[in-house]
A protein has these predicted regions:
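Hydrophobic core of transmembrane alpha-helices in multi-pass small-molecule transporters
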Residues: 65-80, 202, 281-295
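Helix-to-loop junctions at the C-terminal end of transmembrane segments
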Residues: 26-38, 243-254, 339-340
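Structural signature of the two symmetry-related core transmembrane helices
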Residues: 41-55, 257-271
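Symmetry-related core transmembrane helices of the 12-TM Major Facilitator Superfamily/SLC fold
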Residues: 132-149, 349-366
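Interfacial helix-cap and linker-helix signal at transmembrane-aqueous boundaries
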Residues: 1-2, 33-34, 114-126, 131, ...
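Extracytoplasmic gate region of multi-pass secondary transporters
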Residues: 1, 186-246
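A late C-terminal transmembrane helix in Major Facilitator Superfamily
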Residues: 112, 307-342
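Intracellular juxtamembrane helix-capping segments at the cytosolic ends
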Residues: 79-93, 295-308
C-alpha cells in the first residue's frame, strides 16, 4: 500500500497510532455508555460504524484521509471490541468468568491466525482496496446480525439468570473470597488503592510491549530470521492454552492466585530473555512467555470485576482502559530506545523485570485493600440491621 500510494512508512504508521489514541481517549465514555440500558443499541451502532469505516479505507488516497478514517475506526472499535465483550461476560457469568474471558481472547487469536493468510492472499491477488471492501462487507453481513439477534446486555433481558447465580442463591451466601465490593467509580477514585490498581494495570500493558521487540532481540542474539519467526510462533501457540489455564486459575483459586501465576510466568520469561544466547533459555523463554503474555488480555478485566465487583464494572473498566492503552503505546518505543542508547536489550529486560515486580505488588495491594473494604462494608450493614431491629 505504501509503495502504491507513495507514502513513507513512518507517515503511514501514524494510522494505527491515531486509531489507538482514539480508542484510549474514548474508553471512559464508552464505559459509561456500556453501563446503561441502551448498551445493546450502542453496540449495534458501533459495530456498523466500525464495518463502514473499514470499507471507507478503500477510497482513501492521501494520508489525511487515512488519518480521519483511522480516527473513526478507533472511535467505533472502542465500543465494539474489548470493553463491551468484557462487560457482557461480567454480566452473564457469576461462575467461570475467568475461563469464559480466556475463551473469548483465544477466539480472537484463532480468528487472527485463520484470517491473516486469507487477507494476505486477497491483497496479493485482488489488491488492498478490494480487500478493505471485502473485509468491511463481510464483517457487516456476519457480525451485525449476530449482535442484533444473539447479544443482550444482561440475562434479565432474556428472562434468565447469569450462569452461577442459582448456586449463589442455594448456598444462601457467597464465600468470602467471592463477595463483591460493588463500589462506584466516583467513590473509588477517591481511594489511593484505586490509583495503585490503575498503575498496576498500566504496567501490565507497558511491560507486555516486550512482544514487539522479542523477534529483534532473538536476531540480535545471533539467531537467524527463521529462528526468530519460529520462536514467535511457539509462544503465540502456547498462549492459546495459556489463556485457558490462566482463566481457570482465576476461577478455581481466586484473584490473588491468578495474579501470582500470570505475573510470575511473565517475570521468569523476561529473565530468560537476558540469557537467550544460550539456546535452552531461548526455548524456555518462549514457553514461559506463552503463559506470561496472557496477562495482557485476560488479567485486567478479570481482576477489575474481582476487586471492585460487577455492579459498576462497565464504568470502572471503561475508565481504567484509558491508561493501559497509553502504557502499551509507550512501552514498545521505550524498550527500543533503551536498545538504541546501550546497544543491547539487557538493560531494557532488567527494567521490565523490575517493573513486573512493582506491578505485582500494586495489584496484590489493591486486592488486599478491597477485601478489607468488603469486611468494613459488611460490618456497617450488620450494625444498621441490628439498629433497625
Amino acid at each position: 500500500m505504501t509503495e502504491d500510494l507513495g507514502f513513507t512508512r513512518s507517515g503511514y504508521a501514524l494510522v494505527s497510532t491515531i486509531a489507538a489514541l482514539m480508542m484510549a481517549f474514548m474508553s471512559p465514555f464508552i464505559g459509561k455508555i456500556m453501563s446503561k440500558p441502551y448498551m445493546h443499541k450502542a453496540l449495534v451502532v458501533c459495530m456498523i460504524g466500525n464495518c463502514l469505516a473499514y470499507y471507507c479505507y478503500s477510497f482513501a488516497s492521501t494520508l489525511p484521509q487515512f488519518y480521519v478514517t483511522a480516527a473513526c475506526i478507533g472511535f467505533f472499535e472502542c465500543g465494539s471490541t474489548m470493553i463491551p465483550v468484557s462487560v457482557l461476560i461480567t454480566n452473564w457469568f457469576r461462575k467461570k468468568r475467568g475461563l469464559v474471558m480466556s475463551i473469548a481472547m483465544v477466539g480472537s487469536s484463532i480468528g487472527g491466525t485463520i484470517l491473516s493468510p486469507i487477507i494476505g492472499n486477497l491483497i496479493a491477488s485482488q489488491g488492498w482496496r478490494f480487500t478493505y471492501k471485502a473485509v468491511g462487507i463481510t464483517r457487516l453481513v456476519i457480525l451485525v446480525p449476530l449482535v442484533l439477534l444473539v447479544i443482550r446486555r444482561t440475562p434479565a433481558d432474556m428472562g434468565t439468570k447469569a450462569y452461577g447465580a442459582d448456586e449463589e442463591g442455594e448456598t444462601g451466601k457467597a464465600r468470602k473470597t467471592e463477595r463483591e465490593w460493588n463500589v462506584s467509580l466516583k467513590e473509588v477514585k477517591k481511594k489511593p488503592m484505586f490509583w495503585c490498581f490503575v498503575l498496576g494495570c498500566t504496567l501490565i500493558s507497558a511491560t507486555a510491549a516486550v512482544i514487539t521487540q522479542i523477534p529483534a532481540s532473538v536476531m540480535d542474539a545471533g539467531y537467524a530470521t527463521t529462528t526468530a519467526a519460529s520462536i514467535a510462533s511457539l509462544y503465540l501457540f502456547i498462549a492459546i492454552p495459556g489463556k485457558l489455564v490462566l482463566g481457570h486459575i482465576y476461577d478455581r483459586y481466586g484473584v490473588k492466585a491468578g495474579i501470582l501465576f500470570g505475573n510470575t510466568m511473565f517475570f521468569l520469561s523476561v529473565i530468560c530473555l537476558i540469557f537467550i544466547k544460550h539456546q535452552p533459555f531461548l526455548y524456555l523463554m518462549a514457553i514461559l512467555f506463552g503463559f506470561g503474555t496472557c496477562i495482557g488480555t485476560v488479567s485486567a478485566p478479570v481482576i477489575t470485576s474481582g476487586i471492585f465487583g460487577t455492579k459498576h464494572y462497565a464504568e470502572i473498566y471503561g475508565f481504567l482502559s484509558l491508561f493501559p492503552s497509553v502504557g502499551y503505546a509507550l512501552g514498545g518505543p521505550l524498550i527500543a530506545s533503551a536498545y538504541d542508547l546501550t546497544g543491547s536489550y539487557n538493560i531494557a529486560w532488567i527494567i521490565v523485570a523490575a517493573l513486573s515486580i512493582v506491578m505485582t505488588a500494586f495489584l496484590l495491594y489493591s486486592y488486599r485493600v478491597s477485601r478489607v473494604c468488603i469486611k468494613e462494608q459488611e460490618k456497617t450493614a450488620d450494625r444498621a440491621k441490628n439498629t433497625m431491629q
